[in-house]
Amino acid sequence: WFIGIDGSFAPWVGSVINDINQKIAIICPEGREEEVVKRLARVGYDNTVGYLKGSFSTWKKEGREVGVVIQETAPELAEKHSKTQNILDVRKPGEFAAEHIENAQNQPLDDVFNSLKELDTEKRYHVHCAGGYRSVIFISILKSKGYNKLIDVKGGYQALRREDIPKTDFTCQTTQKEGG
Protein backbone atom coordinates (compact mmCIF):
# COMPACT_ATOMS: atom_id res chain seq x y z
CA TRP A 1 0.00 0.00 0.00
CA PHE A 2 1.02 3.58 -0.47
CA ILE A 3 0.93 5.96 2.48
CA GLY A 4 2.75 9.16 1.60
CA ILE A 5 5.38 10.40 4.04
CA ASP A 6 4.56 14.06 3.43
CA GLY A 7 0.91 13.92 4.49
CA SER A 8 -0.71 12.85 7.78
CA PHE A 9 1.49 9.78 7.76
CA ALA A 10 1.30 8.47 11.34
CA PRO A 11 -2.49 8.78 11.84
CA TRP A 12 -3.20 6.98 8.57
CA VAL A 13 -0.66 4.23 9.30
CA GLY A 14 -2.53 3.65 12.57
CA SER A 15 -5.91 3.69 10.84
CA VAL A 16 -5.23 1.37 7.92
CA ILE A 17 -2.58 -1.03 9.21
CA ASN A 18 -4.58 -2.88 11.84
CA ASP A 19 -1.90 -5.35 12.93
CA ILE A 20 0.81 -3.60 14.92
CA ASN A 21 3.08 -6.60 14.21
CA GLN A 22 2.62 -6.30 10.44
CA LYS A 23 5.92 -6.61 8.61
CA ILE A 24 6.60 -3.37 6.77
CA ALA A 25 9.00 -2.81 3.88
CA ILE A 26 9.76 0.83 3.16
CA ILE A 27 9.94 2.43 -0.26
CA CYS A 28 10.60 6.12 0.14
CA PRO A 29 12.78 8.86 -1.31
CA GLU A 30 16.44 8.08 -0.79
CA GLY A 31 17.75 9.60 2.43
CA ARG A 32 14.39 9.51 4.24
CA GLU A 33 14.47 5.85 5.31
CA GLU A 34 15.50 6.59 8.90
CA GLU A 35 12.79 9.24 9.20
CA VAL A 36 10.13 6.74 8.10
CA VAL A 37 11.38 4.08 10.54
CA LYS A 38 11.28 6.61 13.41
CA ARG A 39 7.82 7.84 12.49
CA LEU A 40 6.51 4.28 12.30
CA ALA A 41 8.09 3.43 15.67
CA ARG A 42 6.50 6.48 17.32
CA VAL A 43 3.07 5.02 16.60
CA GLY A 44 4.05 1.49 17.67
CA TYR A 45 5.06 -0.11 14.38
CA ASP A 46 8.46 -1.63 15.12
CA ASN A 47 8.43 -4.48 12.62
CA THR A 48 10.18 -2.78 9.71
CA VAL A 49 11.91 -5.50 7.71
CA GLY A 50 13.94 -3.16 5.53
CA TYR A 51 13.84 -0.61 2.77
CA LEU A 52 14.39 -0.60 -0.96
CA LYS A 53 17.86 0.81 -1.56
CA GLY A 54 17.74 3.36 -4.34
CA SER A 55 14.04 4.00 -3.76
CA PHE A 56 11.31 3.53 -6.34
CA SER A 57 13.64 4.20 -9.28
CA THR A 58 15.56 0.99 -8.45
CA TRP A 59 12.32 -0.99 -8.55
CA LYS A 60 11.49 0.40 -11.99
CA LYS A 61 15.02 -0.10 -13.37
CA GLU A 62 14.83 -3.77 -12.42
CA GLY A 63 11.68 -4.09 -14.51
CA ARG A 64 9.46 -5.01 -11.59
CA GLU A 65 5.71 -4.58 -11.76
CA VAL A 66 4.50 -1.08 -11.00
CA GLY A 67 0.95 -0.19 -10.06
CA VAL A 68 -0.34 3.13 -11.26
CA VAL A 69 -3.15 5.34 -10.08
CA ILE A 70 -5.08 6.83 -12.97
CA GLN A 71 -6.07 10.44 -12.38
CA GLU A 72 -8.64 12.75 -13.87
CA THR A 73 -9.00 16.43 -13.18
CA ALA A 74 -12.12 17.90 -11.61
CA PRO A 75 -13.06 19.60 -14.92
CA GLU A 76 -12.77 16.23 -16.73
CA LEU A 77 -15.09 14.58 -14.23
CA ALA A 78 -17.54 17.50 -14.30
CA GLU A 79 -17.67 17.39 -18.11
CA LYS A 80 -18.88 13.80 -18.14
CA HIS A 81 -20.66 13.69 -14.79
CA SER A 82 -23.96 11.88 -14.68
CA LYS A 83 -26.11 10.46 -11.94
CA THR A 84 -25.09 6.97 -13.03
CA GLN A 85 -21.40 7.49 -12.29
CA ASN A 86 -19.98 5.89 -9.19
CA ILE A 87 -18.28 8.56 -7.10
CA LEU A 88 -16.65 7.59 -3.82
CA ASP A 89 -15.97 10.33 -1.31
CA VAL A 90 -13.40 9.00 1.18
CA ARG A 91 -13.52 12.00 3.52
CA LYS A 92 -14.71 11.64 7.11
CA PRO A 93 -18.50 11.52 7.63
CA GLY A 94 -18.58 15.08 9.01
CA GLU A 95 -16.79 16.44 5.95
CA PHE A 96 -19.18 14.55 3.70
CA ALA A 97 -22.23 15.78 5.64
CA ALA A 98 -21.06 19.39 5.31
CA GLU A 99 -21.12 19.26 1.50
CA HIS A 100 -20.62 16.64 -1.19
CA ILE A 101 -21.28 15.75 -4.82
CA GLU A 102 -24.87 14.62 -5.25
CA ASN A 103 -25.17 10.83 -5.48
CA ALA A 104 -21.63 10.30 -4.15
CA GLN A 105 -21.14 7.45 -1.68
CA ASN A 106 -19.29 8.18 1.54
CA GLN A 107 -16.67 5.46 2.08
CA PRO A 108 -14.30 6.99 4.67
CA LEU A 109 -10.66 5.95 4.43
CA ASP A 110 -10.60 4.91 8.07
CA ASP A 111 -13.33 2.38 7.25
CA VAL A 112 -11.69 1.13 4.03
CA PHE A 113 -11.87 -2.56 4.89
CA ASN A 114 -15.65 -2.41 5.32
CA SER A 115 -15.82 -0.73 1.90
CA LEU A 116 -14.54 -3.96 0.38
CA LYS A 117 -17.85 -5.60 1.28
CA GLU A 118 -19.91 -2.86 -0.36
CA LEU A 119 -18.04 -2.22 -3.61
CA ASP A 120 -18.03 -4.21 -6.84
CA THR A 121 -14.64 -5.12 -8.33
CA GLU A 122 -16.17 -4.85 -11.82
CA LYS A 123 -17.46 -1.27 -11.47
CA ARG A 124 -15.52 1.88 -12.29
CA TYR A 125 -15.26 4.35 -9.41
CA HIS A 126 -14.07 7.95 -9.29
CA VAL A 127 -12.49 8.47 -5.87
CA HIS A 128 -11.80 11.73 -4.07
CA CYS A 129 -11.05 13.11 -0.63
CA ALA A 130 -10.51 16.75 0.29
CA GLY A 131 -7.24 17.32 -1.57
CA GLY A 132 -5.84 14.06 -2.94
CA TYR A 133 -3.83 12.43 -0.15
CA ARG A 134 -6.41 10.06 1.37
CA SER A 135 -7.89 9.03 -1.97
CA VAL A 136 -4.52 7.67 -3.15
CA ILE A 137 -4.16 5.62 0.05
CA PHE A 138 -7.72 4.30 -0.40
CA ILE A 139 -7.07 3.41 -4.04
CA SER A 140 -3.77 1.67 -3.26
CA ILE A 141 -5.46 -0.53 -0.65
CA LEU A 142 -8.37 -1.41 -2.94
CA LYS A 143 -6.05 -2.14 -5.87
CA SER A 144 -4.19 -4.63 -3.66
CA LYS A 145 -7.55 -6.39 -3.15
CA GLY A 146 -8.41 -6.67 -6.85
CA TYR A 147 -10.25 -3.39 -7.50
CA ASN A 148 -8.64 -2.08 -10.68
CA LYS A 149 -11.22 0.32 -12.12
CA LEU A 150 -10.43 3.21 -9.79
CA ILE A 151 -9.77 6.78 -10.88
CA ASP A 152 -8.37 9.41 -8.53
CA VAL A 153 -9.89 12.88 -8.87
CA LYS A 154 -6.89 15.20 -8.83
CA GLY A 155 -7.24 17.96 -6.26
CA GLY A 156 -10.13 16.23 -4.49
CA TYR A 157 -13.21 18.07 -3.28
CA GLN A 158 -11.29 21.35 -3.16
CA ALA A 159 -11.08 21.18 -6.95
CA LEU A 160 -14.55 19.67 -7.46
CA ARG A 161 -16.37 22.38 -5.53
CA ARG A 162 -15.25 24.94 -8.16
CA GLU A 163 -16.90 22.91 -10.95
CA ASP A 164 -20.44 23.06 -12.30
CA ILE A 165 -21.42 19.71 -10.87
CA PRO A 166 -24.48 19.06 -8.66
CA LYS A 167 -23.55 19.39 -4.98
CA THR A 168 -25.50 19.37 -1.75
CA ASP A 169 -25.96 22.69 0.03
CA PHE A 170 -23.21 23.51 2.51
CA THR A 171 -24.13 22.80 6.13
CA CYS A 172 -21.78 24.06 8.82
CA GLN A 173 -21.10 21.05 11.02
CA THR A 174 -20.40 23.12 14.14
CA THR A 175 -23.98 24.41 14.16
CA GLN A 176 -25.65 21.10 13.37
CA LYS A 177 -27.21 19.44 16.43
CA GLU A 178 -26.83 15.76 17.32
CA GLY A 179 -29.59 13.63 15.84
CA GLY A 180 -30.86 16.48 13.71
Where are these regions (language model features)?
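Rhodanese-like catalytic fold shared by cysteine-dependent sulfurtransferases
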Residues: 1-180
